[in-house]
Design a protein with these regions (language model features):
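Non-heme di-metal
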Residues: 1-186
């Protein structure tokens, strides 16, 4: 079942309170919108890593759709807070300067299980980020969005953890290797 059981239309956009927006939070949300929306690059890369695993590839495709939705919703909020924010232009610049292993045909972390360890670390960190964003803002729409996205990110952590368990026996990464991968993503 997809984590995102909500749509952008369910956000209480009419409750937006511009007086509750601060510049640092706005900058963080703009950046998060770009990273989340850039999921297509991650999906393409992970699709190569898990080329022989239809189950994991389907989960990754669903994850990517949810990440893109997060980016769209965060960008919409950022444009409410800053009507001059041109998300499409910012996304073009972002993609020109940041590419995720475009030439890799296998995991850059040594194995599929290693890749899943890295994803677990990232999803855990992003869920914490969105919980902090939710708890640290007085702006009601952002609070709602951050809560929904945090919930999705916790689900994504579990999705990648379950996939890790499916791959762990075949890849046999020792404790030192798992720690190296995890610390490399912190």
């Amino acid at each position: 079942m997809p984590a995102t059981a909500w749509t952008p239309d369910q956000i209480d956009w009419h409750r937006f309170a511009p007086e509750q927006v601060d510049a640092r939070t706005l900058a963080a949300v703009k950046t998060a919108a770009l990273v989340e929306f850039n999921a297509d690059d991650y999906v393409a890369y992970l699709g190569k890593v898990f080329a022989g695993d239809a189950v994991t590839r389907a989960e990754i495709a669903q994850w990517g759709a949810e990440e893109r939705q997060h980016g769209e919703v965060l960008a919409r909020w950022a444009q409410l807070a800053d009507p001059d924010f041109d998300f499409d232009r910012a996304m073009t610049r972002f993609r020109a300067g940041y590419q995720i292993h475009p030439d890799a045909v296998a995991s850059v972390r040594g194995s599929p299980a290693g890749e899943l360890i890295a994803r677990c670390v990232v999803e855990c960190g992003t869920s914490s980020f969105y919980c902090s964003l939710r708890d640290g803002t007085g702006e009601p729409v952002l609070r709602q969005i951050a809560g929904l996205v945090a919930r999705d990110e916790f689900h994504h952590y579990r999705l990648f953890l379950d996939a890790y368990h499916r791959h762990a026996a075949a890849d046999r990464i020792g404790l030192a290797g798992r720690l190296r991968i995890a610390l490399g993503r912190v």
